[in-house]
Amino acid sequence: KPKEDKEWEKFKVKHITSQSVADFNCTSTMNNPDFTPDGQCKPINTFIHSNTGPVKEICRRASGRVNKSSTQQFPLTTCKNPKRCKYSQSNETNYICITCRDNYPVHFVKIGKC
């Protein structure tokens, strides 16, 4: 099988959560060591409330490296503006634009269509 893309593995950790919007806490999530590799709080991060299947599906027929828009809207939480690593969070439901590489999502480009 093709190597399960390392960047896809990272993408899943950084941007996909199985938690519901109601249960999701930006501050506790963003203070996880995955998000603070150098001890710094990441200024902003968007989470997709979904299992991995529908997100990976966006890249299903994307060979090479290309930005793709989702055809469905996802519930999203954006964590931002940490003051001493305490985050504000905002929720919305929207399309997402991601970078695909050889059928795997590898980078979150933005909320909304590409």
From Swiss-Prot:
It is found in: Secreted. CDD domains: RNase_A_canonical. Monomer. The keyword Secreted applies. The keyword Hydrolase applies. GO terms for cellular component: extracellular region. The active site is at residues 15, 107. Its EC number is 3.1.27.-. This is Amphinase-3. Its main location: secreted. Coiled coil: none annotated. Keywords: Disulfide bond, Endonuclease, Glycoprotein, Hydrolase, Nuclease, Secreted. The lineage of its organism: Eukaryota, Metazoa, Chordata, Craniata, Vertebrata. Disulfide bonds join 26-79, 41-85, 59-100, 97-114. Endonuclease, hydrolyzes highly polymerized RNA, poly(U) and poly(C), and the dinucleotides CpA and UpA. More active towards rCA than rUA or rUG. Has cytotoxic activity against cultured human submaxillary gland carcinoma cells. Substrate binds at residues 42-46. There are at least five different forms arising from glycan heterogeneity. It comes from the Eukaryota. Glycans are attached at residues 25, 67, 91. Transmembrane segments: none annotated. One of its GO terms (molecular function) is nucleic acid binding. Signal peptide: none annotated. GO terms for biological process: defense response to Gram-positive bacterium. Belongs to the pancreatic ribonuclease family. InterPro entries: RNaseA (IPR001427), RNaseA-like_dom_sf (IPR036816), RNaseA_AS (IPR023411), RNaseA_domain (IPR023412).
